Amino acid sequence: MNGPALDTLLATHGPVLPVVLPLLAGALLLLLESARSQALQRWVPWVSATATFALLALAALLLRQASGGEVQAYLVGNWPAPFGISLALDRLGALMVLLTAAVACTALVYALGGMAARGLHFHALFQFQLMGLNGAFLTADLFNLFVFFEVLLAASYGLLLHGRGAGQRQRLQAAVHYVTFNLAGSSLFLIALGLLYGVTGTLNMADLAHKLPVLPPGDVRLAQVAALLLLTVFAVKAALLPLYFWLPDTYAAASAPVGALFAIMTKVGVYAVLRVTTLVFGAEVAAPFLSLLALATLALAAVGALAATRLRGLVAYLVVASAGTLLLAAGLGSEGTLAAGLFYLINSTLVAAAWFLLADRIAAARGGSDLLQPRPLGGGWALPGAAFCVAAVAVAGVPPLAGFMGKALLLQAAGPLPMGPWVVAGVLASSLAVMVALARAGSVIFWKSAQVGAAAPDASPAHATALAGVLAAVLALAAAAGPISAYTGAAAGQLLQRQGYIDAVLGARPAPAAWDVRKEMRERGDAK
C-alpha cells in the first residue's frame, strides 16, 4: 500500500483498525488451532506474530497521527453519536494502544520459545485480549467500555489457566479469586450504567459531559452514586487499596508471557479513571479519596515487596506499587502530575513486563524455583544477572533511567500542591523500600547462591530476544526522555481541555454511502 492510500485509510478508519486487526487474527487463529491438519497448525505462530507486529506498526502510525492534537472520531455502522457506537483516537488513546502493542510483541516472542504450546488456543486468546484492550482505550462510550472489559477479561481467564505441569494448581486457585472479583466488578459496572442511563438517557462520554452539569437536582445524587460505583469498578481493575488483594497471587501464578501481557491490564483501570474524571464527571468526584487511597496502596505494596518470599510475588507487588503511583498522579489532577504520571506509566509497564520474563529466566537458572532462598545456581544465568541490574535500577527510580525521571517529574509537579509533602514522603519511602527488597532478592539469588549446581538450559533465542528487546526499550525511553515527556505533557493538556474531545465525537458526521439504511427506513415509513 502506497503512502497516500495508507494515509487515507488511517484518516478514514484509523480508530477502528486496532480493534478489527486482532479480532480477525483471533478468529483465523481459532480455526487454525482447531484444524486437524498439522500443515495448517504450523501456520499458527506465523499468523499470530504477523498480526501482532502489524499491530505495533499500525499503533506507531496512529501515534504519529494523533500527535498533531486532533481528536479523530469514528462512527461504527455510520450511526451518529450519541446513538451509535463511537470510537475516538486522541493522544492518550494512541499512546496506550502503542504501549499495548509493544508489550504484546515482547510477550508473544517469549511465548514462541515453547510456552505457547503448553495449552490450547493460546494465540487466539492472546489476540482477543489485544482486541479488548485496544477497544477499551479507544471507545467513546461507557457501555462499550463495559463490553471491551468483558472481552479482555474472558480472554484473560483462559490465558491465566494456560499451561501444564508445575504451577497448575496455583493458577487454578488464583483464577477462582480473579474471576470472582471481576464478576462482582462487572455486576457493579452494569448497575452504574443503568443508573447513569436512567438519569441522562445516554452513555456516550461526550454526551454525558454535556448532560450531567444540567441534571435536575433530584437526579444529581443518583448520578453521583453511579460515578462512585464506576470508580469502584475501575479501582478493582487498577488494584487500588482495599481492592488489590486479588492481584499479587494472580499475577504471580501466571506464566511468564501471560504475566508480561498482564502488565498492561492494571493500566486499563488507571486509564478509565483518567478518562471519566477528566471528561465525564470532573476531577472533584475522586478528589476527596483517590490520592489518599493511592498513597496507602503505595505503602502497602512496599511492605508486600519487602515481605515477599518468591520473586514472582515480589514482581506482583511492584505492579501494585506502580498502580498506586499512577493513581496518585491522577488523584492530584494537575496538568503537571498527569504528564508525569503518563511518562511513568510507560516506564512502569515496560519494566513490569521485563520483570515477569526475567523472573521466569531466573527460576530456570535455579532449577525451576523462584523462592528467595539460597539455591545452587545452574549455568546460563549471566543474562538474567545483567538484566536484573538494569530492571532493578529502572523500577526503583534510580538515575539515570526513566523510572527516576518519571518520579522526579511527579515530585516536582506535586511539590507546590497541598498534599505535596505527603506525596514526596510516600514516593521516596516506597522507592527506598523497593530498593531494599530488590537488593535483598539479588543478594539471595546471585551472591548467597554460590554453589554451582547442574547446568540449566541456556535461554532459547526467543526468550533472550524478548528480554533483551524489552530492556532495550526501557533504555531507549531514558535516552528519548525529552520528546517523550513533551508528548505526555501534550496528552495531559488534551485530557484537561475536554471540549476538543466532545466536539470531535458529537460533531462527527456519518460518511456518505451508496446505500443508507436509515434513508431507506424513512422512505418506507413515508410510503406507508
Stretches with model-predicted labels:
Residues 1-17, 24-126, 206-210, 494, ...:
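Transmembrane helix-loop-helix hairpins at membrane boundaries of multipass inner-membrane proteins
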Residues 2-9, 88, 134-142, 200, ...:
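Helix-coil boundary and interhelical linker segments in multi-pass alpha-helical membrane proteins
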Residues 11-21, 89-101, 143-155, 221-236, ...:
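Structural signature of hydrophobic alpha-helical transmembrane segments
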Residues 32, 40, 44, 122-218, ...:
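Alpha-helical multi-pass transmembrane bundles of energy-transducing inner-membrane proteins
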Residues 138, 189-201, 265-279, 325-341, ...:
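Hydrophobic alpha-helical transmembrane segments in multi-pass integral membrane proteins
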Residues 174, 224-292, 316:
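Short helix-boundary/re-entrant hairpin motifs in multi-pass inner-membrane proteins
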Residues 241, 345-368, 421-457:
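Predominantly late transmembrane helices and immediately cytosolic-facing juxtamembrane segments
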Residues 371-372, 377-386, 438-528:
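Cytoplasmic/organellar membrane-interface segments at the starts of transmembrane helices
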